[in-house]
Amino acid sequence: MVQLPTVHAHNAAIFQSRPIVAVFAGATSGLGEATLRALAAAHGTNGKGLRVYILGRKREAFQRIVSDCSRLCPTGQFIFIQSPDLSLLGNVDKACAEITKAEQENAKGEQARIDLLCMSQGDFNFDGYQGM
């Protein structure tokens, strides 16, 4: 198995090589939140640039998390995209359009892109549908 210091060194090398653009769906709690915080910490103050689009339902949760992430990565951009329910394809289409527009505006002469996509939104109910 790869040793943890080797993983940390590799991650640091990625961030020092070029700016990173990431999209997180489900980063306002749970695994997505922990992964976002780890990304901000790995980038830290030595990375070439970090821009993260965070899809979520609640702006309040986003603001709390971004406050912490901004301390870990003061040069990072953390952008909230309101997304009420990503289990509905219409909402997914709307979120994608908003991300595309925002990234084209924020790329500032660079190629608009997404380097990393982390999707951990929602939950799964093994008991079946409970709405009726």
PLM regions with names:
Residues V2-M132:
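Rossmann-fold NAD(P)H-dependent dehydrogenase/reductase core
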